[in-house]
Amino acid sequence: MKGIAFGTWRTVSVELPETQILAEQITDSLLSKKIKSYDIQDSTKLQKIGFMNKKPKDYERLVGCSVKTIIHRGNTIRIQMNKKMNLVLCPDYGAQILFHKDEKTLPKKHHLKVEFTDGTFLTIRQTGMGLVYSATDQEAKDIYVIKRDFSDIPSPVGEHDFTFERFRELLDAKGQNIKAAIVGKTAVVVGLSNAAFQEIIYKAGIHPKRNTSTLTDDEKHNLFDSMKQILNSRICSGGKENWLNLYGEPGRHMPVMGPNMKNQNCPQCGAAIEKIAHGGGQVYFCPRCQR
């Protein structure tokens, strides 16, 4: 983690690929570790809006607990411990979740710092909307992100029953804008936001304002294949190029479409990339390739 100014690192949304990477790294680094102590800083605002427990003493319940297993789905990571306790992390719209071998690499600021009995640490600082919650097994059932991400809605990565036939069935069940089908409360998959959406529809050659009811079977196939390819590429590349993993290392995935293409030409056809406000965010696309 040397040389990285964490305080100035750009906030970036965390989607399914980055969540999977974090969960795997947390498993490698924290499994079986026992919590010695915790510290909370600058948490009042997050507590008021529900991003952290309203009672700071709720985190005391984690002291003395050992990490049993880590599960993840969508944008949510659930660190399960003994004594029926959990630390629920959902970095959704930006968070620095970092592992430290000793106190020498601890950042100046954090929202939650967890110290383990072996002298290692986990620090979390939310840089956007997200969740850092201490919860019993029973309490975890009622947490919004748990209900949202650990639901019947399929994950586009890591689940064998998410086939093209299943994807087509979900798309056909209700005609809606293509963005609403990929991102948000009515999405047919979990774990994706505007960043992944822009890449997926660009690679699939689909205009951002299309309705799912107008898609041909070939276009649905392209959408399904593009989703798989983009997400797996991000996982293999260690996440987005402007995102930091658990060890403070930046990802290497450069988006094929998004804000990085501002004032650029399409690498496939040479047309000027355009931007529109759509579905609660800015969407970049190629007006020639995406129809």
Please state what every model-predicted region is.
Residues V14, P91, A95, R148, ...:
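Flexible, active-site-adjacent loop/turn segments at secondary-structure boundaries
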Residues V132-Q176:
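A short, charged helix-loop
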Residues S13-L16, V157, D161, T216-F224:
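Generic detection of long, well-ordered alpha-helical segments
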Residues E103, R148-G158, R210-D217:
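Short histidine-centered catalytic/ligand-binding loop motif
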Residues S29, T120, A135, H160, ...:
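Noncatalytic, beta-rich nucleic-acid-contacting surfaces in large DNA/RNA-processing enzymes
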Residues G3-Y144, R291:
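Acidic, proline/glycine-enriched N-terminal capping motif
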Residues K34-D58, I71, R78, R166-R291:
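Basic, nucleic-acid-binding surfaces and adjacent catalytic neighborhoods in DNA/RNA-processing proteins
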Residues K104-K108, D161, D172, G191:
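Short, amphipathic alpha-helical segments
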